[in-house]
Amino acid sequence: MREYQSISSLQTFVDCPRCYWLHYIAGLDGESSPAQVLGSEVHEAIRDYHTHGTHSNELSEVGGKLYKVYVENVPQSILDEPEREFLVPLVNIVTGEKLPLPFKGIFDGISTKTGWIHEHKTASNYWKLEDINDNIQATGYAYAYFILFGKLPRGIRFNILKKNKITCKYQSLETWRTYEDLIYFFNWAKRIFEEIETSDFAPKQTRFNSHHKMCPYAGN
């Protein structure tokens, strides 16, 4: 039985219940994609930058370019808590209803002085405001911030690092969440909890064809 849920686990179930079962119940870890490997590499370097002023890990060519673009645009002192982990109860902030498992995640960075959450993303294309205004991760992390600090975050800033073989670009987008959004997040999570309880974990084709290697849809 799982001890917690996360944005990744809940979203995986929404995308493909079979992939959820394989990864989160059977414990069969899938292989990381090249994009995931690059993202982890850059996130680690950014964490070290905000903690120590420089990075300690060896970077790939593209990873080095993305890191360079980041430090040229984001001050080292802007975050006082890079990669802060959290584990919070999933509670309806109005009714007090509580879900059986807590919510776990990691803020890429927060500033306790300004109240901003920072999320770092590597991407092949520029993002649009719609991408972050409807982003369930941002809503979930705003909820976690509220539970931890007793107030809404001032905002969520996405530091987007656009990659290509020649040049890498930096894009900053900002979004906000309301108390109504926090209730929406609880209800979203509750619905998925209920669906998991009765699911037969049948496979489902995902939008971007991203599947666990043992899913019948893998490679299709």
Language-model regions: role of each:
Residues 4-5, 99, 144-220:
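Metal-dependent nuclease catalytic regions and adjoining charged, substrate-binding loops involved
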Residues 24, 119-122, 160:
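Residue-level recognition of conserved beta-strand positions in structured domain cores
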Residues 26, 47-51, 122, 146-150, ...:
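Hydrophobic/aromatic-lined pockets within catalytic cores
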Residues 29, 126-127, 164-166:
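Flexible loop/turn segments at secondary-structure boundaries
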Residues 35, 127, 131-135, 175, ...:
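Flexible, glycine- and charge-enriched loops at secondary-structure boundaries
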Residues 1-112:
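Metal-dependent nuclease catalytic cores that hydrolyze phosphodiester bonds in DNA/RNA
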Residues 87-138, 146:
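Non-catalytic protein-protein interaction segments used by genome-maintenance enzymes to assemble
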